[in-house]
Amino acid sequence: MTRRVPAPLLVLAAIVSVQFGGAMAATLIPLVGVFGSVTLRLTIAATVLLVIVRPRLRGRSTTDWLVVAAFGGILAMMNLFFYGALARIPIGVTVTIEFIGPLVLATVLSHRRRDLLAVAGAAVGVALISGIAGTPWAQVDVTGLGLALAAGAAWAGYIIFSARTGARFAQLDGLAIAMTVAAVLVAPAGVITAGSAIWTPDALWRGATIAALSSVLPYSLELIALRRLAAHVFGILLSLEPAVAALAGLLVLDQQLSAPQLLGMVCVVAASGLVMGRRSVPSAPAALAETTNQ
């Protein structure tokens, strides 16, 4: 059935799924905290992937395990930073600022000086989104902005190690193992900080929904789409994520953005489309930049 659906529509469906999963995560954080939310998301997603993928564990080299372990560690940090930012600032702002990570990485890999102008435009966009220019410093949520930037840096690291892991592990084997590593790293703190609240039906169904929307469904859709979609087209579609995140925040969380913030979002989306939408951008970052962080 998915063969009849145009690949761009599959990617758009994956983006919508991820961002609404992120908006759903913002409703889980007040119940079990950041660590508890990340624990539920990673543990459930890892369990589903292990059952579906059944990764091969034998015959792996030491380097294979080091690479996938590093991938899992970055995956854990990326989720913690992202959820930490979600707890403090709107999801549209979080995703837009986080997007600077893969944008800068794509610019560095492109080796084109003019792409620096796009990064500069994105920086202006982030300044508008954060409200730093027109808001007293004491009222700026510096911690939230810092966590979003840290999530972006981790996202760039995820792209790099995702490519390295993909080169060493067949299909989704590496992702399933890395997700398990991330879950093991975060789970102790998540269970301790959330306490009995993490086992309540409300928390569990929200966690399962987030895992499905943010991991299982988009991974499946993208795996199909990327087999018949050019990397530069994928990059253009990817640049729509901040806008979709803002829409999800409005519909699910009633988070409304100001005119300057919307203008800043346009700057980041335009910069991302220019850099990651070019045919000369290396395919690995474009193909791997999508949403495991959310």
Summary of predicted features, one role per range:
Residues T27-I44, F82-I100, D141-A154, P201-S215, ...:
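Structural signature of hydrophobic alpha-helical transmembrane segments
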Residues I29-M77, V104-L105, A154-F161, A176-T193, ...:
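Transmembrane alpha-helices of multi-pass small-molecule transport proteins
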